Amino acid sequence: MQGLTGWMNLTGEPDGPPTKSGLSMVDYSGGLIASIAILAGVHSAQRTGKGMDCDLSLYDTALSLLTYPATWWLSKEYEVQRFSRSSHPSLVPFQLFKASDNWFVVGCAKEKFWERLRDLLGDERLKDTKFESFASRFENKEELIEILDEIFVNKRADEWLGMLKEKQIPSGPINDLKNVFDDEHAKSRNMIFEYEHPTLGQVKQVLSPVNVGDSNKVDISRAPLYAEHTDYVLRLSLIHISEPTRPNE
C-alpha cells in the first residue's frame, strides 16, 4: 500500500531504492481513522436516532496522509524529491548530522533557531550573507551542510545535544529501543503496562496514549485469549433476549 500510494517513492536516500516506513503506518493510521469515523457515527446516532455506515479504506487513508506533497502535485504538478539524511524539503538546516559517535537531528524551523545555532558554533563561515535567510541557505545548502558536518564530527552526540538543549535549539538523538525505554521521560509518562500472560508469562507492552478525564491506566487488563470470554458473552446475550423490549429500542 505504501508503494501504491506514493509513500515509498518519497522515502529514502536520493540515490537509493524506494523505501517503506519502518512501521506499518498505513495499517495503524487506518485504525485511528476508523475510530474517529465510529465516534462521529455514534455521536450522530445520539443526536438523530439513526445509525450510519462508516466507509473506510486503507487506500483512502494513505492518500489523505500525503498531505502537502499531494497538494503541491495536484495544484502545480510539483513532485517532492527525496533529500539526503531525512532533510526537510525547504528548511535548512533541518536533518540528520553525524557526531564523532552517533547520529542526531537538528531542526531550525525558524530564523531564531538558526541564529542561535550559528552563534553557538562560532564558526566565521556561518556568518556569510549566503546563509542569512531560509531562501539563501536552501540555495547554498550543500556548502552549508559541508561546514556543519566538519564542525559536528568533533564532539560526541550527547555533548552536542546538551549544548543545543541549553540554547533551546530543536534537536534530538537517534535512539534504539533500549534507549527509548530507558529514557526518564518515557518512564514518567507511565506508558508501559506489565502483566502475567496465561501462556507467555510476564509480558510488557506500550499502552494507548489516550489518557483523558478520570481514566486510570492501572485498571487496564490484557487482551483476552481466543474464546476466553465466550460463556460470559453468551450469558449476557441470554439476559438481553429475556428482557422485555423497551420503547424506542
What kind of feature is each model-predicted range?
Residues 1-104, 108-109:
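Active-site-adjacent "lid/gating" segments in soluble enzymes
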Residues 62, 140, 179-183:
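Beta-rich nucleic-acid/ligand-interaction surfaces
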Residues 84-89, 94-95, 139, 200-203, ...:
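Short Gly/Pro-enriched turn/cap motifs at secondary-structure boundaries
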Residues 92-167, 171:
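Aromatic-enriched alpha-helical interface/lid elements that frame and gate functional surfaces
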Residues 132, 200-238:
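Flexible, small-/acidic-enriched active-site or ligand-binding loops
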Residues 166-218:
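A glycine-rich dinucleotide-binding beta-alpha-beta segment and adjacent secondary-structure elements
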Residues 239-249:
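Single conserved hydrophobic/aromatic residue that forms the stacking wall/gate
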